[in-house]
């Protein structure tokens, strides 16, 4: 899509392909958003438990899948998500043409990690961030076991260096 938007200055006819491209992008994006949100939910369950164990029960880890604002429920039916994505893209259509950049879609999505209700990215210490990262890795390990029936090999380098003694235990 970005290529279409960038090249449209030299080849204005490319913009004629954008509505159909956006429609297909919304259909595929809906599948991706729903899958990611489902995975994030599994990750949240395991990561919260692992984080509680690593922090001695003193902290609560939460995860939230963040997508475009018009998608009210990323676990809704794909047709609902696709319609909401299309609404979002239509509201950004003029801005995308002006900037010649793709401004919305699943490529902009993120997982928000919080410890005790505070954004890990903005408010947590290095030890808390490392604990959250370790909890996420341990959660991925559990999901792998659920999916394939065995634990994966995990190589974790220098995991304990920035953790306080309680977390190291």
Feature map (PLM): residue ranges:
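Conserved NTPase motor "head" modules and their coupling/switch loops across ABC/AAA+ ATPases, GTPases
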Residues: 12-27, 31-155, 161-166
């Amino acid at each position: 899509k970005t290529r279409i938007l960038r090249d449209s200055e030299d080849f204005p006819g490319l913009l004629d392909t954008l509505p159909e491209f956006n429609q297909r992008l919304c259909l595929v994006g809906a599948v991706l958003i729903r899958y990611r949100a489902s995975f994030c939910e599994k990750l949240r369950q395991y990561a919260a438990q692992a984080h509680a164990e690593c922090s001695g029960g003193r902290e609560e880890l939460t995860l939230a899948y963040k997508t475009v604002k018009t998608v009210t429920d990323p676990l809704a039916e794909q047709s609902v998500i696709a319609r909401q994505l299309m609404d979002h893209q239509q509201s950004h259509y003029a801005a995308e043409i002006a900037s010649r950049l793709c401004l919305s879609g699943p490529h902009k999505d993120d997982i928000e990690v919080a410890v005790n209700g505070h954004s890990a990215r903005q408010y947590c210490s290095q030890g808390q961030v490392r604990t959250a990262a370790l909890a996420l890795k341990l959660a991925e390990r559990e999901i792998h076991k659920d999916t394939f029936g065995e634990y994966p090999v995990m190589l974790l380098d220098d995991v304990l260096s920035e953790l306080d003694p309680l977390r190291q235990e």
